[in-house]
């Protein structure tokens, strides 16, 4: 038979295979009813826990929804799961929506405890395709990173693979090989000694794209000389030759020990698929949602992303053509699955979306001030999508539709820079399950698939897509559409990058970069992983970095040298050889940046000390809880302070959601070797006896530690038990030798200085010889939350090296290590710079005292500021209404923490006294449980509420009200007595001094995906300092923070990261 005649048979073969014809006949004989499709399919694994269950029948169901809810049973481990039922397509489909997300890593069964009634008096009993009666499916492991939740088995192994010799899905000469593992693969699997290779019969390695992410592995052979031809008809393995796929020494993320490594070898002999034919399949437009899926009732080919951070974003209408290569049907028996593939590099585009916070508050483009749009959304296939058209598994009826199974690895990105950075990523193992029918010469595919993108690196979202594809197969259509597919000839273009150029919006982005933060390049299309190793270079101070780590995720290339970037060193990123999937070479000019310096010629000699800026869960102060701890009632203790009474509130015992890691952020880069699980970092399970004694039930909770230069995360092996109590301890000592390598007794920074936990007691509370000052934090396990934990850092800061001092000979100097850089003038005064606060003496005492300089001289507008070092954790709750304005808003809760600041001098006219505060501490107070409560006895256990909303100018803003304590444990006074500077013994009231800040400011979204929140005060807090010198000299200094005198600047974490160490 000649080839062109073979092709001419394809439409007729498709008609027969898909249960239809140009004029589909109707069998007059009544047929029994049956189920013909389900999502998930019977036996499907790695199903999203947020999936709805869809059932499709041969005939319309006549039971009402209430009856169906009683007849249909959804179970897991013998427990029924509540759900609602919706009739779709006049009853031919049912959608079951679970009341709550399904548990991860669990098996579920759908059965009918009574037959369902269908049209014509038919009865439809419990369906079955494989295994036990009913539809059996298993949900995926959790993305939380905790071993018990992420793993689907105790050992690292293959959970399932496709193709597989023992399944209907056999290896073909155009197959792509996919593996789902029982545990997530370690991101550094290659540097840990792992390898993945495909070899031919002679042992030679076969060129292939290897993709690894989460628990998924894909090996996509490409044997054509040109990358653009990957997935074409020429890209096939040799039929009849034996190939071997080797997975060697692969490490698991949750247990990378040698004992848990995976090694496996798989041999296969690919089956011939030729002569193949390519069909052009078109994604049908839903007409603004008018056309809906017969399977689940959703708009056809429409993408809606469900999340807390962006609300319900969509629908975005998918458009475009896919070119599916089908195997030669006559070579396959009627009961065999007919293989197909869609070539690597295929693209589906979706229409632009408006970007909102929480689905309610408009995001603005930082550069233009216009409403932020995504621009065209693209989904690009990173490997050949491979699938099968199979006989219907639920019924033997020859008129039933065929089943479609399609596996894809895709990259998603957007046209506009900010949403591109927020969404760009690889989505591995996307699985479509659907049905295929031919009607009037048109092959029609209806399928359901789910994707779960990680938004902003903070939240796993979900989207269910109802695909509807059509391909004409009649005599007038193109017999083979291979030549209609346009090949990509456009090189990739850089859209944005982090930290960004010197003129980025805002211009301070390079000053916000810290060791541990990566460099991220965001392109407009995915890159070829094979081009990364030699296609990009990081130049440090004129020399190439030899230990550069690189990761590719979607269109984002993430770079970080081992040990992190360094302060005060010029860097340049050189791109020379990066290509897209088709081999087109990127052209990018060198990207230069530099982190702010933290020292000059070895100065300052005062290196400061590392502080715990945020502790999650908990409050970052050394706590006195021996006589106050009450675990049952959630009472912890008070921060130790230099005041004899430990001024301040009693802190609550924090609640910790079951699936979250302990996270601690530090002010300086750590000596990561000093963070030792079970020694300097301990996590215990505890209990409290009736007499108040604390008992340690587990000396060290099993888990893994993820270290970055200025942050650590501890993931417990098992979820925190609801109602169980825990304590974690960060070791700190002021004893000499505590930071000796190999003999650490403290967590230490890179300068060999131990963690300081007791700043509230002063810079030196024991002359360097007062033993341990461990930071101990107690918490209680609680249920997992659906809200989004969003950590923030306060950058940029003038005190770049975080030593709580400004390293300049003069505070107003602009030519020093940490130069003065404020808006304003010496004549008119200055506004605070980012993360600074301005203090003034009240006007009625201007002759008695002045901030920064002597009362009898010229004023000093540059010396009226303190500079803060801190971080902040937040919880994004979701849509609400601004209680002040009634406008749409998104509620955000703030976790209280403490801020460290530089010193401030206040000069008095009396005896020319200079009062120096020393480093100060601002403590955020927990909110009142009852906002209407007044007085000192009000219970304070609640997080601080805030709101993202719009102001009268249409700008996105954040507003909150924070109650604080001010502590100045090092406050001292120096007087001029007979012309001699003399220190005066001093008592004062700056211990737990309460005041309130009412804050508001813009929310700005960077083109690298990060969010910036500016906060300025619009009230005028009074701080009335009362001091007694020598026991007899009473002094009052009435200070104020003027309106707009506080400027706080928060930024969210980078959207991608490369941890420095995993343990």
UniProtKB/Swiss-Prot annotation:
Lipid-modified residues, S-diacylglycerol cysteine kind: 18
Summary of the knockout phenotype: Mutants show a lower rate of biofilm formation on solid paraffin and on the liquid alkane n-hexadecane, while growth on nonalkane substrates was not affected. Planktonic growth on water-soluble substrates is not affected. Mutants are impaired in the assimilation of n-hexadecane solubilized in surfactant micelles.
Record carries keyword Transport: yes
Short name of any one Pfam family annotated for the protein: Big_5
Induction annotation: Expression increases during biofilm formation on n-hexadecane. Forms an operon with aupA.
Signal peptide: 1-17
Topology of this chain in the membrane: Lipid-anchor
Residues covalently joined to lipid (N-palmitoyl cysteine): 18
PROSITE patterns: PROKAR_LIPOPROTEIN (PS51257)
Alphabetic keyword roster: Cell inner membrane, Cell membrane, Lipoprotein, Membrane, Palmitate, Signal, Transport
Biological role: Required for growth on alkanes. Probably involved in the uptake of micelle-solubilized alkanes. May facilitate the transfer of alkanes from the outer membrane to the inner membrane.
SUBUNIT field: Interacts with the outer membrane protein AupA.
The protein, known as: Alkane uptake protein B
Gene for this chain: aupB
């Amino acid at each position: 038979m000649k080839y062109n005649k073979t092709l001419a048979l394809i439409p007729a073969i498709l008609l027969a295979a898909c249960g239809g014809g140009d004029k589909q006949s109707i069998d007059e004989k009544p047929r029994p009813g049956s189920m013909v499709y389900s999502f998930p399919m019977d036996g499907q694994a790695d199903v999203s826990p947020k999936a709805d269950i869809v059932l499709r029948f041969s005939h319309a169901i006549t039971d009402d929804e209430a009856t169906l809810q009683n007849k249909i049973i959804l179970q897991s481990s013998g427990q029924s799961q509540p759900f609602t039922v919706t009739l779709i397509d006049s009853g031919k489909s049912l959608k079951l929506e679970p009341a709550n997300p399904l548990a991860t890593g669990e098996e579920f069964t759908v059965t009918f405890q009574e037959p369902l009634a269908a049209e014509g008096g038919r009865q439809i009993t419990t369906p079955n395709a494989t295994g036990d009666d009913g539809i059996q499916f298993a949900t995926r492991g959790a993305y939380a990173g905790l071993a018990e939740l992420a793993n689907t088995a105790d050992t690292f192994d293959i959970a399932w693979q496709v193709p597989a010799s023992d399944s209907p899905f056999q290896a073909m000469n155009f197959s792509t090989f996919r593996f789902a593992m029982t545990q997530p693969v370690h991101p550094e699997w290659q540097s840990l000694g792992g390898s993945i290779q495909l070899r031919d019969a002679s042992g030679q390695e076969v060129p292939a794209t290897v993709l690894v992410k989460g628990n998924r592995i894909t090996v996509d052979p490409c044997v054509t000389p040109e990358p653009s031809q990957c997935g074409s008809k020429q890209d096939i393995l040799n039929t009849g030759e034996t190939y071997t796929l080797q997975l060697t020494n692969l490490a698991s993320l949750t247990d990378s020990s040698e004992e848990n490594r995976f090694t496996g070898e798989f041999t296969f002999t690919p089956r011939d698929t030729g002569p193949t034919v390519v069909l052009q399949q078109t994604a049908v437009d839903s007409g603004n949602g008018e056309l809906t899926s017969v399977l689940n009732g959703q708009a056809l080919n429409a993408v809606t992303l469900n999340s807390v951070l962006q609300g319900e974003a969509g629908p975005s209408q998918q458009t475009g053509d896919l070119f599916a290569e089908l195997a030669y049907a006559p070579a396959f028996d009627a009961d065999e699955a007919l293989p197909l593939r869609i070539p690597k590099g295929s693209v589906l585009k979706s229409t632009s979306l408006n970007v909102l916070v929480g689905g309610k508050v408009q995001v603005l483009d930082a550069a233009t001030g216009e409403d932020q749009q995504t621009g065209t959304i693209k989904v690009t296939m990173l490997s050949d999508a491979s699938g099968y058209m199979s006989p219907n598994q639920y019924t033997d009826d020859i008129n039933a539709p065929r089943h479609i199974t399609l596996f894809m690895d895709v990259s998603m990105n957007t046209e506009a820079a900010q949403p591109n950075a927020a969404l760009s990523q690889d989505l591995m193992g996307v699985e479509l399950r659907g049905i295929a029918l031919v009607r009037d010469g048109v092959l029609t595919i209806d399928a359901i698939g789910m994707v779960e993108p990680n938004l902003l690196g903070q939240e796993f979202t979900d989207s269910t897509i109802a695909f509807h594809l059509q391909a004409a197969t009649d005599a007038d259509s193109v017999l083979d559409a291979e030549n209609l597919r346009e090949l990509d000839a456009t090189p990739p273009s850089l859209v944005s990058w982090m930290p960004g150029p010197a003129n980025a919006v805002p211009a301070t982005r390079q000053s916000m970069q810290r060791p541990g933060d990566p460099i991220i390049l965001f392109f407009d299309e995915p890159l070829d992983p094979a081009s990364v190793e030699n296609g990009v270079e990081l130049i440090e101070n004129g020399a190439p970095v030899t230990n550069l780590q690189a990761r590719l995720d979607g269109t984002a290339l993430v770079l970080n040298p081992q040990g992190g970037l360094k302060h005060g060193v010029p860097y340049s990123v050189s791109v020379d050889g990066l290509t897209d999937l088709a081999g087109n070479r990127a052209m990018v000019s060198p990207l230069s940046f530099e982190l702010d310096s933290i020292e000059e010629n070895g100065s300052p000699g005062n290196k400061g000390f590392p502080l715990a800026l945020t502790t999650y869960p908990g409050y970052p102060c050394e706590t006195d809880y021996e006589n106050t701890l009450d675990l049952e009632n959630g009472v912890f203790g008070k921060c130790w302070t230099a005041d004899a009474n430990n001024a301040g509130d009693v802190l609550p015992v924090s609640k910790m959601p079951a699936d979250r890691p302990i996270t601690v952020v530090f002010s300086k880069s750590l000596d990561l070797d000093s963070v030792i699980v079970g020694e300097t970092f301990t996590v215990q399970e505890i209990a409290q006896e009736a007499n108040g004694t604390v008992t340690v039930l587990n000396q060290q909770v099993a888990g893994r530690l993820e270290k970055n230069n200025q942050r650590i995360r501890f993931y417990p092996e098992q979820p925190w038990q609801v109602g169980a109590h825990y304590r974690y301890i960060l070791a700190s000592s002021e004893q000499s030798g505590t930071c000796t390598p190999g003999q650490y007794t403290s967590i230490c920074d890179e300068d060999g200085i131990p963690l300081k936990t007791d700043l509230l007691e002063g810079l030196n509370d024991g002359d360097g010889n007062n033993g341990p000052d461990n930071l101990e934090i107690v918490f209680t396990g609680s249920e997992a939350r659906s809200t989004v934990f969003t950590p923030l850092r306060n950058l940029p800061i003038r005190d770049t090296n975080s030593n709580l001092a400004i390293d300049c000979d003069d505070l107003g100097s602009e030519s020093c290590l940490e130069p003065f850089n404020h808006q304003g003038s010496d004549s008119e005064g200055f506004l605070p710079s980012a993360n600074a606060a301005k203090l003034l003496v009240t006007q009625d005492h201007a002759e008695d005292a002045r901030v920064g300089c002597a009362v009898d001289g010229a004023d000093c507008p540059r010396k009226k500021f303190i500079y803060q070092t801190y971080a902040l954790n937040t919880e994004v709750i979701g849509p609400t209404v601004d209680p002040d304005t009634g406008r749409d808003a998104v509620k955000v809760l703030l976790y209280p923490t403490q801020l460290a600041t530089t010193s401030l001098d206040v000069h008095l006219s009396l005896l020319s006294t200079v009062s120096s505060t020393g480093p100060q501490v601002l403590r955020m107070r927990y909110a009142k449980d009852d906002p209407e409560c007044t007085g000192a006895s009000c219970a304070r256990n609640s997080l601080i509420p805030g709101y993202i909303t719009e102001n009268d100018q249409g700008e996105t803003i954040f507003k909150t009200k924070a109650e604080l304590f001010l502590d100045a444990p090092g406050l001292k006074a120096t007087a001029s007595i007979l012309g001699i500077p003399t220190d005066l013994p001093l008592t004062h009231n700056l211990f737990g001094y309460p005041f309130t800040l009412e804050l508001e400011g813009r929310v700005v979204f960077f083109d690298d995906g990060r969010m910036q929140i500016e906060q300025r005060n619009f009230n005028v807090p009074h701080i009335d300092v009362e001091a007694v010198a020598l026991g007899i000299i009473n002094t009052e200094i009435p200070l104020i923070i003027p309106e707009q005198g506080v400027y706080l600047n928060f930024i969210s974490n980078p959207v991608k990261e490369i941890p420095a160490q995993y343990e």
